[in-house]
A protein has these predicted regions:
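C-terminal binding/interaction regions
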Residues: 6, 67-126
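Short, ordered loop/turn segments at secondary-structure junctions
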Residues: 10-12, 39-40, 61-64, 89-92
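Thiamine diphosphate
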Residues: 7-10, 20, 25
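Short glycine/serine/threonine-rich phosphate/pyrophosphate-binding segments
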Residues: 15-18, 38-47, 66-69, 94-97
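Glycine-rich phosphate/diphosphate-binding loop of Rossmann-like nucleotide-binding domains
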Residues: 1-14
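Glycine-rich phosphate-binding loop
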Residues: 22-64
Length: 126
């Protein structure tokens, strides 16, 4: 949709300090929503959410023998007080995470709102 974003590759298991630093600094960098994608134990979305108050959307990835079901359960079963929004598994989930992020940011950002509304209008008409 042409919305400004950044991409970071972080691991909650291999680089937990980097995840904590990124998550804690996100708000001061102007980041309004974090999309965290993870497979297997899928600790990344919950770890990010533990370190920031901005919305976190988790995307379970089909990286294991059970094709992402483990990641889905790990993301949706967060303890009270540390919420993570969760979308579907894999590519469709990743796409819906971006659309959900746009719908979260849109009410405060006219440019994002216009892009997202245009996208939705195009879906209805085509």
């Amino acid at each position: 949709m042409g919305i400004e974003h950044e991409l970071n590759i972080l691991s909650a298991h291999r680089k937990p300090q980097a995840v904590a630093e990124y998550s804690q600094q996100a708000k001061s960098k102007g980041i309004e929503v974090i999309i965290a994608m993870a497979g297997g134990a899928a600790a990344l979305p919950g770890t990010v959410a533990a370190w920031t108050e901005i919305p976190v959307i988790g995307v379970p990835l089909p990286t294991s023998e059970v094709k992402g079901i483990d990641a889905l359960y790990a993301i949706v079963q967060m303890p009270p007080g540390i919420p993570v929004g969760c979308v579907g598994i894999g590519e469709w989930g990743a796409r819906n995470a971006a659309y959900l992020a746009a719908s979260i940011v849109g009410p405060q950002d006219e440019g994002v709102r216009d892009l997202y509304e245009s996208y939705r209008k195009n879906l209805r008409e085509n």
